Amino acid sequence: MSRDDDDDAVYETLSVYERSFSAISERFFKKSAWPKAEAIAGLADNDAMFKMMYSELYYRHIHAATTPSAEERKGAWDNYCALFGALSTGEANMQLPTLWLFEMIDEFVYQYQSFQQFKGGAKRTPEEVSALKALDAKVWDQAGVVGVLQTLVDKSGIKAILERERKGEISFSETEGYDLSSSNVLTVLGYYAQIGISRVHVLKGDFEGALKALDAIDLDKAGLFTKIAGANVSTRYHAGFAYFMLGRYTDAIRHLNESVQNIERIKFGAIRPHALPLLLKKQEQMYALLAMILSLVPGQNYLLDESVSLTLHQKYSDKINRMTSGESALFDELFSYASPKFVGGDNAEAFKAQQSAFSQVVASHATVPKLRNCLKMYASIQVDKLAALMDVSVDSVKASLTAFNSAYTLKEWNGGASALDGDDTYCGDVKVTIEGDLVRVDEEKRVKSVKEVLARANANLKMGLEDLASARPLVIKASSIM
């Protein structure tokens, strides 16, 4: 880490962090722990900050290479509390790569999730149960985790900084939080802590809380989270999943479409090789979410980029057809695959609670695909004839028509300050009006506006130019040293 204002020192730190640590781990500590901080602290004059930073990597490696014990999980928690507590004072006189700072927050939340999965698992040994009981109840407790992250948000003043950026007064995201006149550490940690809080809420099933935590971040513009592949994917996956569970399907599509495109664009060289499998798995999960959305509310393909739509068709056309034909078991299968690992008490019960809520949504949309296919054949049709076509009673088809309009009336974000903002919008390509015993059908051809197409093309061009730029940027990107 750099304790001066030398730009080169930050790049050297990034090189050690990205390359050297993983290379040494692979060669000498593939299935074992690194030496403890106390064993090597003398090499850094027993510097307290060095020991905490080193220990963060030490415990991170233990979680990646071994199965950590309850005591090691506690050690990681204690070290994070000490490290973030020290950094929250704002007195750190060093610059750190933004990649490392994001991954500190990301790993902190991962270890919380890992601990909760360990604690709520059904296959613990008697020794593990005993070790867990011996731990303080606050170790990796949700309130404690959110409290640590919220302290970073509050102490960093990041919300005020992002508000000034929205007004055009500063360019925090453009400089990636890197400032030669002061340390970037607390400010950038505060930024990514918001994303961490959002992720914790998703894991607990609080989807409105997850989106609320992102209020200060403009998710529909390039920002600090879009500069790092892992941050971009994590943010959009969890935001997309939150929208998905809230039934805001067009908003979910917007984020999932963007993220799978981004992974496709960067996977052949712009990210570290060892990070690629995780991103590809997340991409597959997002395709599964998109498949479920298009099965629940058919006709939304126009919102997808052409390449995403084609890949989705290749991967899921058969399952989409089967889901729209009423195979609810496929929804369960894809939901199990695409959802995050929920936490809270018993792991299995936490998942079942979310799956049950989603199953109710699937049931309420059961008649939508078949009814849509029937309606698209007519400009108007008698209710009794429609009932005969669907082989149901007149009362049932009337209820289905009401449910049809409700299913396609979604709350949709239209540029508000909060990710929770939105207006009720009809997103279907078929709209029905019931006039006595007559059903009138208006079919709307939905396409992206010229403005949307041009904006997307401009964004793709800008990202491509960034990747091709030969000059080394002032600030750190995940691809800077690849």
Residue spans of the language-model regions?
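Extended alpha-helical scaffold regions
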Residues: 1-482
